[in-house]
Amino acid sequence: MFRRERSIPLRSSAAALSNNLSVLQLPARDLTHFGVVHGPSAQLLSAAPEGVPLAQRQLHVKEGAGVSPPLITQVHWCVLPFRVLLVLTSHRGIQMYESDGSVMVYWHALDSGDASSVQAMFARGIAASVHFICVGTCSGRVLVFDIPAKGPNIVLSEELAGHQTPITDIATERAQGQDGVADMVTADDSGVLCVWRSGPEFTLLTRIPGFGVPCPSVQLWQGIVAAGYGNGQVRLYDASTGALHVQISAHARTISALDLAPEVGKLLSAAEDTFVHIWKLNRNPESGSIEVEHCHGECISDTQVCGARFCDPLGSSFAVTGYDLAEILRFGTV
């Protein structure tokens, strides 16, 4: 069971964007960082375990020649083996900062080739894999950046082509050196999923076709792809074969966020229907089939939920953001 805990106030409410919450836990300092997008700015907050806000910072998109400031599409902390970077995507490009947002270490501008003349340019979908950071674009390409152990010498090393429509989300999992193991999945506006193996050159392993609805959020855990769709469904696929194992009518409206607690296999789903659900994933050791169990449901009354994340790898607490809601809601186990 979960209960509501002290919420964290925001200067501005969260924008109505999917995956509009990023969480970075710092156990050594007993702190949790939260990142939320609102229009042309991203709010970064630090909070103590009991939810007491300790610091706030606002980040803005690198200015260009435009009349109005460009909108931010996502903010996300990328945890690499040797450093943590904060990545911000927008209608103008990709910005990478040190983890506290104090120093921008890299800027990548989107070029006109990233979109047609009638389509807005933007980047969206952020994830870290080994020493790479992968970012999706509106053209369906995934940009792979090679990240050094320190300093600003970040290099665009590869562009992955597997999608024809804008990228919505990217998820990764550490493959722990296993050859041939899928460790990244990308999703797009048409619902297509691409499963990849990272490395000096990324390899497309499986392409899972869509079925006419977008896939706003995706996760990867122990060879299981969890995908949340615009019709409220959560589908679980085998990453190696692309086979559909489980289909859940989880929500009544578009799913806005999925998250995983990797140490226990808990899956969190949140949607515009005001509900947040927690599920337990498992792979049957005898049959190899994927199994799922519903663990908890939480109604965020009168709120269009746009972001939700676990706050620890055991899934014992989670946080939620909502459109026009000027606070981050927190829940913890009783």
UniProtKB/Swiss-Prot annotation:
GO CC terms of this entry: cytoplasm; plasma membrane; vesicle
Biological process terms in GO annotation: fusion of sperm to egg plasma membrane involved in single fertilization; negative regulation of receptor internalization; regulation of epidermal growth factor receptor signaling pathway; regulation of MAPK cascade; single fertilization
Keyword Ubl conjugation: yes
InterPro entries (alphabetical): WD40/YVTN_repeat-like_dom_sf (IPR015943), WD40_repeat_dom_sf (IPR036322), WD40_rpt (IPR001680), WDR54_beta_propeller (IPR049546)
Main location: other
Keywords: Cell membrane, Cytoplasm, Fertilization, Membrane, Repeat, Ubl conjugation, WD repeat
Positions of WD repeats: 116-155, 162-206, 250-289
Superkingdom, taxonomy of origin: Eukaryota
Cell compartment(s), UniProt: Vesicle; Cytoplasm; Cell membrane
SUPFAM superfamilies noted in UniProt: WD40 repeat-like (SSF50978)
Molecular-function annotations in GO: protein homodimerization activity
Record has Membrane as a keyword: yes
Entry comment, domain topic: WD6 repeat is required for cross-linking by TGM2.
Subunit structure of this chain's protein: Homodimer and homotrimer; forms tight forms of dimers and trimers. Interacts with IZUMO1 and IZUMO1R/JUNO.
Protein's recorded name: WD repeat-containing protein 54
Native source organism of the sequence: Mus musculus (Mouse)
Encoding gene (name): Wdr54
